[in-house]
């Protein structure tokens, strides 16, 4: 009779990523690229997408690439792994076992004179320096970082050892995002927001609707909440003076940035998601 295993145990969580062709011409990410990133009017520089694992960063990058993909542009990606096959785009999967890491792949592709470079993730200083050098020599560079907010990405780059003047001269925009569960319109129910919730979250400053309504119900699908930091002269000046993330965020808000928390509250008021869901994914980030 087999004896139960005791003591040391193992746990395996497989993550199956079938390589497939991307179908990214619809949905909130496509609208975001069209309305928001293009608003920054940048052709060169570094655009970063930041957020925790599972927040949709890679999908956002793929959507951006599908928007940028034209016959006139040469686009090369370095990824780990290649999650979607994008027609007309050269995609490289890193293989550390044979010595092909992000930095090595990037050193190779910059010699191929691409117009756009997508780096799956900036993981170390060497990769970051090559990305910066690429942007300084006329390439648009897209990549991701793991930080809690757009402003925190700047301090993360500083902590990695990147000089402040290089960040100021190369980073064009940073998008932070989270995914929230979307309320199912078939089961969604509106209710009047209690006064304590209105006061706690400042809901009366975000909508002119009276009474103020929130929504609850079952969930179906997901939606993104985002904050977009576009580099401007004030931010560059603060960066050169080594301002912290909070100071950078305050300056970005004066220029029109909506924090993840505020954007989430607006979606809750619009019935896209519930207040509870917004608080779940943004707690501690401007809440």
Locations of the language-model features?
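Intrinsically disordered, low-complexity segments enriched in small polar residues
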Residues: 6-7, 11, 23, 27
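Short, flexible helix-loop junctions that flank or precede catalytic/ligand sites
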Residues: 1, 12, 22, 31-287
């Amino acid at each position: 009779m087999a004896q139960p295993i005791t003591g040391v145990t193992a746990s395996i969580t497989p993550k199956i990523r079938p390589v497939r062709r991307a179908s990214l011409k619809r949905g909130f990410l496509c609208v975001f690229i069209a309305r928001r990133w293009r608003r920054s009017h940048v052709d060169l520089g570094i655009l970063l997408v930041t957020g925790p694992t599972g927040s949709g960063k890679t999908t956002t990058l793929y959507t951006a690439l599908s928007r940028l993909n034209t016959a006139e542009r040469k686009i090369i990606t370095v990824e780990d792994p290649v999650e979607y096959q994008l027609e007309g785009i050269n995609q490289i999967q890193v293989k550390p076992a044979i010595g092909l890491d992000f930095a090595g792949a990037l050193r190779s592709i910059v010699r191929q004179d691409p117009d756009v470079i997508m780096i799956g993730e900036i993981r170390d200083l060497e990769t970051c320096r090559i990305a910066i050098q690429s942007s300084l020599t006329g390439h648009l560079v897209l990549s991701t970082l793991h930080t809690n907010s757009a402003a925190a990405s700047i301090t993360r780059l500083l902590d990695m050892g990147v000089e402040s003047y290089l960040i100021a001269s190369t980073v064009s925009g940073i998008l932070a995002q989270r995914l929230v569960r979307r309320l199912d319109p078939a089961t969604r129910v509106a209710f009047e927001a209690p006064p304590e919730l209105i006061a706690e979250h400042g809901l009366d400053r975000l909508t002119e609707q009276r009474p103020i309504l929130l929504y609850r119900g079952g969930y179906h699908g997901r939606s993104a909440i985002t904050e977009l930091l576009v580099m401007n002269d004030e931010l560059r000046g603060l960066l050169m003076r080594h301002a912290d993330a909070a100071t950078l965020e305050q300056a970005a808000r004066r220029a029109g940035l909506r924090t993840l928390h505020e954007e989430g509250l607006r979606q809750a008021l619009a019935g896209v998601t519930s207040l509870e869901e917004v608080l779940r994914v943004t707690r501690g980030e401007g809440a």
